[in-house]
Structure formats: structure tokens, C-alpha cells
Amino acid sequence: MLGFTIDVQKVMEIATSIAEISGGTLGTEHILFGLCEVKDSYASEILKRLGVTGDVVGKYIKKSLIPSLVVINSAAKRTLERARVFADKYSDDLADTHHILLAIVYDQNSAGAKILAQYKIDFNTIKDILDSMSANGIKPQDPIARINEMFRNMEQMIFRAEPDNQENTAEPVSAGIKKDN
């Protein structure tokens, strides 16, 4: 069985928090809000390109502010289950934010899909953007890749910061630790 990425866990934490203050039942609209709020993910990038933000989704959620315990509704459960199916279809080991976004728009009757439909966003819109991002090599990085990129950037900054280095023989920084010989 497929699990969920750390980003999806963040999405669900945000969705649960919002559901607590807006009626207690966690729905796709809360998950959609979480997708908007978790930055550097496929879903937030797609939604940002389409002009959908947490503020936009939040306006719909704020209409029903009744504090209570959070219970996930059946549409949200189906969305999470369907996200795992999409992850499997894309040969991904874990369901990620873009799989959840696809699952939300797949169910046209869900509250999240209805919010997006008002912006003329449907399953095909999301799928086309996702396929385009994948074809162009645009993919959110995992934490280890982010750390490696950070160290590469640091190496470049260190190398440029050495103006006396005429021979361009700066030693690379390996995993953030420079070896002394």
C-alpha cells in the first residue's frame, strides 16, 4: 500500500487545523487550502499558476465557522484513497500533493472541485499542467536533493569569494565538510 509524502502530511495538518475552526468536518475544501499553503510542491505551483491561493479558498471556508471536533468526510476520504491510485499510476512510491490535487478535481462534486471549477479549472487542466511540468523536468525536490543543491550553491559562493584564486583550484566542499589534508 502506498503512503504519503511529508508534504502531504503538512497539507493534512493544515487542513485539519482549518477544519477545527470551520465546523469540524474535514472536507476537500480544507485539503485544497492545505495544498495552496504548502509551498514548493507540485500542487501549490500548479494552483499558483492558475491564480488559486489560500486566500481564495479561505473565503469559501470562512462562510461556515462553527468550532467542533474534526471528522474527515467521505469525499475527503475518497480523495486521499484516489490520490494513492494516481501515485501508483504515475509509478510513484508515495502519494504527493499533485496526486491529491488530481484526486480533488477528479470528483467534480467535491467542494474542492467546485471551488476550482469557478476558476474554470478541471481535471484536464491540472493533468495538462502536471504533464507539462514533468516533461520539462520540473519536479519539487526531496529534502536530500535540496540539501545537496544548497551545498553546491555554497561551493560556488566560496569559489567566487576567493578573488586571489588565479588557478581556479578551489577544493569542492563534500557534504558540507571540507577535509583538511
Question: What feature does the model see in each segment?
Answer:
Residues 1-181:
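Histone-fold recognition with a strong bias for associated Lys/Arg-rich disordered tails
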